[in-house]
Amino acid sequence: MAGEQKPSSNLLEQFILLAKGTSGSALTALISQVLEAPGVYVFGELLELANVQELAEGANAAYLQLLNLFAYGTYPDYIANKESLPELSTAQQNKLKHLTIVSLASRMKCIPYSVLLKDLEMRNLRELEDLIIEAVYTDIIQGKLDQRNQLLEVDFCIGRDIRKKDINNIVKTLHEWCDGCEAVLLGIEQQVLRANQYKENHNRTQQQVEAEVTNIKKTLKATASSSAQEMEQQLAERECPPHAEQRQPTKKMSKVKGLVSSRH
């Protein structure tokens, strides 16, 4: 339905409202809850709160670093900085691994199991596939497992939080995408133009052929009519001489009759 919000969105809003009025250890406990909460995979709004940013100056700076890592980082980033960060619970660890899959999916549409096993520091294929299935059920990715070729084929993934410093790169990418679209559009327009020209030439040729066929039909019809008239004329000429010969004896007979009458 239009305007319907997912429970995770409402849950994040509740955490943000709670965070606005807390500080110190209460705020770090709230951050830990957010990082464990099912369905919450974006943290930018929470990071923007002034009291959350103030954690950078105190003894709880590690929690701000951890929140930043969940917003922008991956599981390998956590492993690389593990000594200076709070220990993750099982739920937090799985969520960060889910977010790592999302980051990989944004760059690759077919992710080899070998890459996933390495980045997620997993050795068991069954556990890896279970983790991927969990990510699919949380709607952060859509795809299918190709067990034969050991690939995760990605159809869709959610967007992660964006750093301000990354905005210029995003704008650049969008400009390049627009330029690519314009190039494709120009190519399509040229193909349409060539197709229209081909169609016009084809229609013109077809009209010429039809006109020639019509002329040939007229010529054949006229020739056939002329031949028929000639044949009729020849037949008529052949029939005329016998009639003339029959008339001449009649005249001679009348002359003979006249001579006979005069003698009498």
UniProtKB/Swiss-Prot annotation:
GO cellular component: COP9 signalosome; cytoplasm; cytosol; nucleoplasm; nucleus
Compartments, record wording: Cytoplasm; Nucleus
GO biological process: COP9 signalosome assembly; protein deneddylation; regulation of protein neddylation
Keyword Phosphoprotein: yes
Main location class: cytoplasm
All copies of domain PCI, residue ranges: 2-159
Record flagged with keyword Phosphoprotein: yes
Coiled-coil boundaries: 188-237
Location of the region described as Disordered in the Swiss-Prot/TrEMBL record: 223-264
PROSITE patterns in UniProt: PCI
Membership in a protein family: Belongs to the CSN7/EIF3M family. CSN7 subfamily.
Compositionally biased intervals (Polar residues): 223-232
N-acetylalanine: modified positions: 2
Subunit composition and interactions: Component of the CSN complex, composed of COPS1/GPS1, COPS2, COPS3, COPS4, COPS5, COPS6, COPS7 (COPS7A or COPS7B), COPS8 and COPS9 isoform 1. In the complex, it probably interacts directly with COPS1, COPS2, COPS4, COPS5, COPS6 and COPS8. Interacts with EIF3S6. (Microbial infection) Interacts with vaccinia virus protein C9L.
Domain of life: Eukaryota
Protein name: COP9 signalosome complex subunit 7b
UniProt-listed InterPro entries: COPS7/eIF3m, CSN7_helixI, PCI_dom
Keywords: Acetylation, Coiled coil, Cytoplasm, Host-virus interaction, Nucleus, Phosphoprotein, Signalosome
